[in-house]
């Protein structure tokens, strides 16, 4: 099984956690149409304050538009992506 950071969405999130917006954005752009990457893409645009663009990417990812704390959202995304990368399935995945 691949390590969690081997997934594009988690690699992008790791770049965002380092403050490397452009690197994170490039990763998700290269994986446009993959729901996990689209979710991180939405987060990135919300982080930069581009709420209209963020809303578009939340819709593409099949997610509700986030409105709460950015750090809490990032933690939620990380936990969900790590569950997925770990191969877990079911209602909590």
Segment roles from a protein language model:
Residues 20, 42, 50-53, 85:
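A structural signal for the main folded, soluble domain(s) of proteins
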Residues 1-3, 10, 66-93:
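Intrinsically disordered, low-complexity, charge-biased linker/tail regions
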Residues 33, 47-68:
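TPR/TPR-like (Sel1-like) alpha-helical repeat modules
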Residues 2, 25-35, 62-66:
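Solenoid-like repeat scaffolds
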């Amino acid at each position: 099984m691949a390590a969690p950071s081997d997934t594009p969405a988690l690699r992008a999130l790791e770049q965002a956690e380092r403050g490397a917006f452009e690197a994170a954005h490039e990763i998700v752009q290269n994986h446009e149409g993959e729901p996990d990457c689209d979710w991180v893409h939405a987060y990135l645009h919300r982080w930069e304050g581009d709420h209209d663009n963020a809303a578009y990417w939340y819709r593409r990812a099949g997610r509700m538009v986030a409105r709460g704390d950015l750090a809490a959202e990032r933690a939620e995304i990380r936990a969900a992506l790590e569950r997925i990368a770990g191969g877990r399935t079911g209602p909590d995945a």
